[in-house]
Each structure stands twice: as C-alpha cells, then as structure tokens.
C-alpha cells in the first residue's frame, strides 16, 4: 500500500483539519453507495479509511511518522486495519446505517473495551516490570437494571419512531444518522434513575496485576482479556494498557539501540586509553582508538534494548565528548610547549601542502 499521506493527498506537515477535509472529500467520492459494484472504488475507499484511522489519531500518526507501518503493527497490534463502512458516518455525520463493532452496541451506552495509560521509567522499559494498577470500569446500574429509568421502563423515542436513526439529505445523497435524542437506541426514559443519573451504568474502581515485558516503547498497547467494561448482557470487554516510557537523564533510545555521550579528557582520546562507561547493566570498559576525535562513536554490542518480537538485543553506542582544559599551570604549559615543538615538522609539512594547493 502507498504512503498514507499520499493516499489522502496531503503533505506530511498537514494539520488535523487538512487531514479531516481530505478524508471527507475522498471518502464521499469513493463511497460504495455512489459506486455500486465498483470493486476498485471499494478498495480505494478502504485505503482512504485506513489512512485516516492512522493520520487522524495523534498517537498513531506519531508512531507512523517515526517507524512507518511496521511500527504501527507492533505498537497497536494491527487493531486499526479493519473497519466497517459506518466509520465515515460516525466521524462526520454522527453514525450510519451500518453495523457497530463489538466494542460498542446500541444497547450499551459505553464501549466494552477500556484503555488506561501507564507511565514507566526508562529502566523498567529495559528490564520489564510488574504492575498493580487501579482503574475504573463501567457496569450496568443494578437499581435500574441498566435502563437509566427510575421505573426500569423504556419508551419509544418520538423523534425517530424507535428506529434509532434519522435520515438526512445532502444533495442527491441520503445519510442515515444516529438519532441524537436516543443515541441510536430507539428508546428514551421518562424519569432518570437517581443512582446512575439516567446513564444506565455506574463506575467501579478495580485493580489488575500484569507484566510489562522488557523492550517496550512508547505507543505499545498491551491487551488484557476480560478486564474491561461489562455490558447489560454480562459480556466483558478487554483492557488495553497504553505504555508511555519516560526519558532518561543520560541514555537516549533509538529503536532497539541506546545512545550515551561520555566526556573524555583530550589526553585519553589522543593516547587511546581505556575508559569506563555506564551501561544499563553497570559499568563496562571501553578501549578508545589512538587519536580519537570529538564525537567519535564506539559500539558495545548487545547492550541495547531486547526486541519484543525477535528477542535480539540492540547495541549501546557511546559517543565521546573530548574535553580540553581551560586553565593550565606553568608546568603543564611547559610540557605542552615541548609536545608542540615535537610536532612542528609535521605541522610545517601539512602547511606546505595547503600552500601548494593554492598555486
């Protein structure tokens, strides 16, 4: 599939409004209702919808910009790939005449699946960590049996006649929009339940214990089955844990590799001394090359993050920051002068080459 930005015909720095407008225009153009029997238009419509599901979501867009589609597959478990044709109406017209996914049904006022954000340290992301988190789930109100009505009775919505939809026209197109009064249920309550304020559900605090595997990065979602919201029929959704990894003071992550900048005295760099560098597993020795320069990089293999899928560890890249003294004693100046004199012939030879270049 082409680049998502190319599919929607927008630049990579497009803002959310530009992306939304481009999606709406293309989705209306290629919608199956306007292209009955046209398989090519149907495939194009699917591509457009998938592109918008990524670019229209800030978190997914950031992951896509950084890692491409492969990064989305890892970070979001490919949960954005499927769609139904009602998505376009849900986004722009408040609902459509298509089936809802399992996540939300017309007889429930909330999604079955729930999501929480968990922030962890750089160290916990490297080694993995166990968590015990408190969060809230939605469940049917027992007082009104999930109806939201004081007398537990529901009445037919007078605005949509119980269909749950209101038809709107735009030019030669007709759109079935979710009824804004009954929220698509086709039913309303006369007097609200006091315990749930007419919502039909209450929120309850629960806790869950789970493991975050080593190697996770910001954007990863962990699915915990049967720990989400509860429907009136007793069906339980899943809990999705969105992981956010905090930045470290010294280490910087790039994919599975870790970067660190280490200060090195100029004599250590020139002489190629052995230095000690911090790693996630503790200090390790690193042999510098003779004549090392500022910003030179050295690789310590297998000291990076372990890849969640392949279980292969990345590397630690050490970049040296060569330090030179700002103040010198008389003795140090004398020693450096002697060292400089010993290199005079070499320096003169280099200067002669530069002069010859201009002739």
From Swiss-Prot:
Q: What does this protein do?
A: Participates actively in the response to hyperosmotic and heat shock by preventing the aggregation of stress-denatured proteins and by disaggregating proteins, also in an autonomous, DnaK-independent fashion. Unfolded proteins bind initially to DnaJ; upon interaction with the DnaJ-bound protein, DnaK hydrolyzes its bound ATP, resulting in the formation of a stable complex. GrpE releases ADP from DnaK; ATP binding to DnaK triggers the release of the substrate protein, thus completing the reaction cycle.
Quick one: a GO cellular component term? cytoplasm
SMART domains cross-referenced by the UniProt entry? DnaJ
Quote the entry's note on domains. The J domain is necessary and sufficient to stimulate DnaK ATPase activity. Zinc center 1 plays an important role in the autonomous, DnaK-independent chaperone activity of DnaJ. Zinc center 2 is essential for interaction with DnaK and for DnaJ activity.
Q: Name one GO molecular function term.
A: ATP binding
**PANTHER family (alphabetical):** CHAPERONE PROTEIN DNAJ, DNAJ HOMOLOG 1, MITOCHONDRIAL-RELATED
Chain positions recorded as Zn(2+) 2 binding sites: 157, 160, 179, 182
UniProt xrefs under InterPro entries: DnaJ, DnaJ_C, DnaJ_domain, DnaJ_domain_CS, HSP40/DnaJ_pept-bd, HSP_DnaJ_Cys-rich_dom, HSP_DnaJ_Cys-rich_dom_sf, J_dom_sf
Q: Which organism is it from?
A: Campylobacter hominis (strain ATCC BAA-381 / DSM 21671 / CCUG 45161 / LMG 19568 / NCTC 13146 / CH001A)
Q: Does the keyword Chaperone apply?
A: yes
Q: Where in the cell is it found?
A: Cytoplasm
- Which prosthetic group or cofactor does it need? Zn(2+)
Keywords, in A-Z order:
Chaperone, Cytoplasm, DNA replication, Metal-binding, Repeat, Stress response, Zinc, Zinc-finger
Family under the similarity heading: Belongs to the DnaJ family.
How is the cofactor bound, in the record's words?
Binds 2 Zn(2+) ions per monomer.
Q: How does it assemble?
A: Homodimer.
Q: Where are the CXXCXGXG motif repeats?
A: 141-148, 157-164, 179-186, 193-200
User: Which residue numbers delimit the J domain?
Assistant: 3-68
Query: What would be one Pfam family of this protein?
Result: DnaJ
Main localization of the protein described in the UniProt heading: cytoplasm
Keyword Transmembrane among UniProt keywords: no
Q: Which gene encodes it?
A: dnaJ
Q: What is this protein called?
A: Chaperone protein DnaJ
